[in-house]
């Protein structure tokens, strides 16, 4: 097993997008949001990560980072897109996914915290496109991600006063 740790909070990171429109809703310039130049890792760390993934001979590659990599269909949940996570840097995430696919890198597990609840998902270019990814079989998945809840801060169910399922 190879353990790869990256910093998605301070080193090389471009400030997350945000701001409000005249109605108080989060306003995002879509062209800036989807820009191929926006980076969460910074170019040096991004290159280092890709090298680590490609050079690894381990069966399992574990990537630990601070923010959720999976895509979230936030609007369907009545939430804003989390621009402070990989959803705020979609072009860079896609570059990593393209690299995984083109190099045939298998058995990548992403471990994440920060979101104050537990999540698990297959990582794929578009988890909502059933022609390229099967939620039933996982076909089309490039990696998996496990997100842990908070230890000492309030978790999302407590913050939103939502009962678990």
Give the location of each predicted region.
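Long, structured stretches of catalytic cores involved in phosphate-ester chemistry, encompassing
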Residues: 1-165
